[in-house]
Amino acid sequence: MNAKKRPVSFYENDYDISEFDEIQVPQHIELAGYDKIHYINTMYPWEGHEYRRPAGTCNHIGEGMFSEASYNPTGSYVRFFDLEEALIGKRVILSFEGAEQAIYVWINGEFVGYAEDSFTVSEFDITPYVKETGNRLCVEVHKRSTAAFLEDQDFFRFFGLFRDVNLYGLPDIHVSDLWIRPKCALDGRQASMEIELKTTKGKTASYADARAEICLLDGHQMIAKEEVSVSESFRADLTISEPVQLWNCDDPKLYQVEIRIFDGQGDLIEIIPYQVGFRTICIEDGIIKLNGRRLIINGVNRHEWNAKSGRCISENDEIYDIECMKRNNINAVRTCHYPDRTTWYYRCDEAGIYVMAEVNLESHGSWQKMGAVEPSWNVPGSVELWQDVVLDRVKSNFEMFKNHTSVLFWSLGNESYAGEVLKEMNAYYKKRDPGRLVHYEGVFQNRDYEDNISDVESQMYAPPGRVREYLENEPKKPFILCEYMHDMGNSLGGV
């Protein structure tokens, strides 16, 4: 239903939904038989139909933009639920793993929040609104929003709740953030681990006498242990007395971190298991090195895709893709052009697949018009108005995947030109996580920023001669061909 004709008050507790249809979640609304399926490459889908320009780039941005647009399909979801017994009395979190493209959320008639960024988990604390029984969850999903200027990827344009929606409960003291930083010598003979933790607590809970027990195991063998007091923010340093085995694509050795939280009465209230590996990544003498050796990348770009269900994929789809990659000696993947399901990164850790973790950003239609480079109103570019919203996507990507050994590169996005905002994105990663490399191809289109954005020279579809020319003329950076053959449908014959 178009935004202007949507049932505006559907979230009210007494609103009659007897005329509503049923839909499976997760699922794209289009593949449930509503709206039209659109496939678009570089242009924004409204070009030629409605005039729109991003905020901060032109005096006139278009009448009504998306909320009053003549075409902006909207899905109104209603779900009734009771709390499971295990959630009663706990802080309750509502989690959307993927919602395209913008959502408004209500619980029992009360507005809970709004979220954009289709491919990043959005979570809401619904404790003040939820009851033990008879809850009414309402979600309004808009196909287009201001986020549309940043999500112009070359793919089918869907909308809806296309990943899982979950409820989970928090204990009285909960580890809300965890950063595990393994450190090792190139031969693995010396190793240590820094772990930073942040916690939240319930209104009646106390940190008094609460403690954390942190263990590092190799299989069933304990190789390091530390016990520390719990507070809102604390850390633990593990010293490892024996050599460790380094992680790589041929032998993706993982160790087990186990964190146990005890309250002031000595009761165990939370256990956090995590698998991590020891490895190093750096650039030395113009060469990318993993564990001190030259890194050889045999990689692919991977969209999340199932021929029947679109970007609504299953665990079996992920397992099939991993097995296919290993069969074909593929050792690296770029999450083009958005964060994947969180389970994918764990699979890459276990399988030894090097990951280039990409931010959900592509603004192709703002700087390339009908094939010509014309960046007069590109976003995010150097438009300060867009900086915070883009940095939010950068931070989300970092916080979600910072503990994954397989992530060697942070990628700033895809085909979004270059400017001061991309420069700030690069700076965020370099300051926050200097132990990884940053990738971005867009500076190829704007060389003014090649010294401030990306640790590597990245190009797309370059013929071998152009690659050779770059490498033979005192290259500033290592070269990565981040895309080399467009494989869509029954294609890839050019390889």
List the predicted regions and their residue ranges.
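Accessory beta-strand-rich segments of carbohydrate-active enzymes
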Residues: 1-2, 6, 28, 32, ...
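Surface beta-strand/loop "capping" patches
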Residues: 172-202
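N-terminal carbohydrate-binding accessory modules
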Residues: 179, 258-327, 346
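Accessory carbohydrate-binding/adhesion or oligomerization-edge regions at the termini
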Residues: 1-56, 136, 140, 217-219
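Substrate-binding/catalytic cleft of secreted carbohydrate-active enzymes
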Residues: 323, 332-495
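Short hydrophobic alpha-helix segments
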Residues: 113-115, 226-228, 272-274, 298, ...
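Short strand-turn-strand beta-turns centered on an Asx-Gly dipeptide
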Residues: 106-112, 217-219, 291
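Extended acidic/polar, glycine-enriched regions
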Residues: 130-134, 198-282
